[in-house]
């Protein structure tokens, strides 16, 4: 039986685990892959990671400052090993259930929607801790408290148009240098989409023809520096920004766009869609955690100390609605302090 089980080894989970180790709490950090911090691990190679907001003081037993992806991952690997954090790799949580007494009047309603628009409602009775965390390999981990730090990147928003399920549509770019002499279309003009487009167009020797689609003429979700750099690349002829353009359909070798001037069919060998992500709602609700609304992008209901509607299960990081790394790390530190009785 652990005092706390932390699920997910992103910035929030790592910070929580490091604090638990520093305080001498019995703990386990469950990571479904064979490496730490999968979200940052999947960042584009060489990506510069920002440390915003700059005026926020970091509360964590592991370090973080702006720098290259590879440097940050190396620092965290070294420090987690130095803190002797109890990490269990290849440990994906399948379910979390309370094994204590039933909580009177505490029921989680789960609404399921069919494709025809009909919906059904079922109820889950909440139970007190300790919690049994069943892993996909059949193993069960017992813990008095659970911290969910699983983020949202494993649940990307999918394209919805004819041909969206074709194999050349992808939602991740690891290394731009892998792609040569291709017509590539980036869908999404947030920071990830812009960085992917610029990375693919950076080296003329790769001979890629890169377009990035923008439904409007503005870039409201991207950092100013990224927008300026993208516009500069467009002006230099390295890539093309297609404004007021949306995907109508996809077929092998081509993509058809709906534009201000009508339909446009252009060559396309690969589509990289970076259109955001949403909380893994089904899994979270099965844990007895209620969401703030029925909207797909809604986040779980949480107390001021990030405790969910399931007593003893805490939600931190991007899954709690805080995508910035420093915020995530502070939350991991603070939740462990709360669990340890330091309110």
Residue ranges and their predicted role:
Residues 53, 71-135, 140-142, 204-293:
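A Rossmann-like FAD-binding core segment of flavoenzymes
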Residues 9-85, 194-225, 291-296, 334:
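Beta1-alpha1 glycine-rich phosphate/pyrophosphate-binding loop at the start
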Residues 7, 140-153, 185-187, 266-276:
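Short hydrophobic core segments
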Residues 148-164, 277-289:
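Flavin (primarily FAD) binding-site architecture
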Residues 1-4, 120-124, 154-155, 161-172, ...:
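Extreme N-terminal leader/targeting segments of oxidoreductases
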Residues 1-29, 172-219, 283, 304-343:
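Rossmann-like dinucleotide/flavin-binding elements
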Residues 13, 95, 154-155, 193, ...:
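Glycine-rich nucleotide phosphate-binding loop and flanking beta-alpha elements
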Residues 288-314:
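FAD-binding beta-loop-beta segment adjacent to the flavin cofactor pocket
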């Amino acid at each position: 039986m652990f005092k706390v089980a932390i699920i997910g080894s992103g910035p929030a989970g790592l910070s929580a685990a490091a604090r638990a180790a520093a305080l001498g709490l019995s703990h386990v950090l469950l990571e479904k892959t064979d490496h730490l911090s999968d979200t940052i691990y999947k960042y584009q190679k060489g990506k510069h990671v920002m440390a915003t907001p700059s005026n926020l003081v970091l509360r964590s037993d592991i370090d973080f400052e702006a720098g290259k992806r590879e440097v940050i991952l190396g620092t965290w690997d070294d420090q987690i090993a130095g803190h002797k954090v109890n990490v269990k790799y290849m440990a994906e949580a399948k379910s979390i259930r309370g094994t204590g007494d039933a909580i009177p009047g505490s029921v989680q309603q789960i609404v399921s929607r069919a494709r025809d628009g009909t919906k059904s409602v079922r109820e889950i009775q909440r139970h007190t801790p300790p919690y049994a965390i069943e892993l996909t390999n059949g193993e069960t981990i017992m813990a008095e408290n659970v911290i969910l730090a699983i983020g949202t990147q494993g649940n990307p928003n999918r394209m919805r148009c004819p041909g969206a399920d074709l194999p050349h549509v992808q939602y991740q770019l690891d290394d731009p240098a892998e792609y040569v002499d291709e017509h590539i279309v980036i869908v999404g003009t947030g920071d990830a989409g812009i960085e992917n487009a610029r990375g693919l167009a950076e080296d003329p020797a790769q001979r890629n023809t890169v377009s990035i689609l923008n439904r409007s003429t503005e870039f409201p979700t991207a950092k100013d520096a990224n927008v300026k750099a993208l516009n500069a690349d467009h002006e230099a002829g390295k890539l093309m920004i297609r404004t007021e353009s949306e995907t109508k359909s996809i077929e092998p070798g081509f993509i058809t766009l709906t534009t201000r001037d009508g339909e446009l069919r252009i060559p396309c060998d690969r589509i990289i869609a970076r259109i955001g992500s949403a909380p893994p709602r089904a899994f979270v609700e099965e844990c007895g955690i209620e969401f703030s609304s029925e909207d797909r992008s809604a986040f779980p209901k949480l107390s001021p100390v990030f405790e969910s509607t399931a007593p003893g299960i805490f939600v931190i990081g991007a899954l709690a609605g805080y995508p910035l790394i420093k915020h995530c790390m502070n939350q991991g530190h603070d939740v462990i302090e709360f669990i340890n009785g330091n309110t």
